[in-house]
Amino acid sequence: MKHYLALIPNILSSLRLGLALIFPFSPEELWLWIIVVSGATDFLDGWCARRWKVSSWQGGLLDAVADKMFMIAALLTFVMAGKFAIWWIPAVIARDLTVAIAAGYAAIIRSWGSFHDMGARWSGKVATAGQFILLITVVLVPGMIPAALLITVSCSAVAAADYGLLFYQALRRQQADKKAVP
């Protein structure tokens, strides 16, 4: 039975990937529902994986890719619809950019373990929640976008700093471990 349970989180993440693909082509009337379903799958995939003890590195990667793809698809769709400024996007995804840069750096210096061992953080969960709140705000209350953007960017900046510090500490530990081995 556990084998089948292990599939559910990945199916939910895959559903979010599918939603990322259809979002740009969906009528505005469906945007809110697609965002809500995407947010629900984001919550449920991790919750199910932890609850049923079926977490995996590959599932975590699929979840992260699905999150980023959906967020970028939604934000670019809003830009194309004239509802969101393109120059706001880097600020909204600052945490994601930080993690991507850290992963690239880890790969270049062949120190993948320092990146691979970084798990989900509370700051990342708050930043993701802020991003989904921003998407809902764009659809439901466009006049509140500046306030939602400020909150989202603040959460994203805190998460970027948190992940950056964690990566730096992991690199330092790894370097210390290498020096300790004769």
Where would I find each of the regions flagged by the language model?
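A feature for the membrane-embedded catalytic helix bundles of lipid/isoprenoid biosynthetic enzymes
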Residues: K2-A6, L32-W33, A64-P182
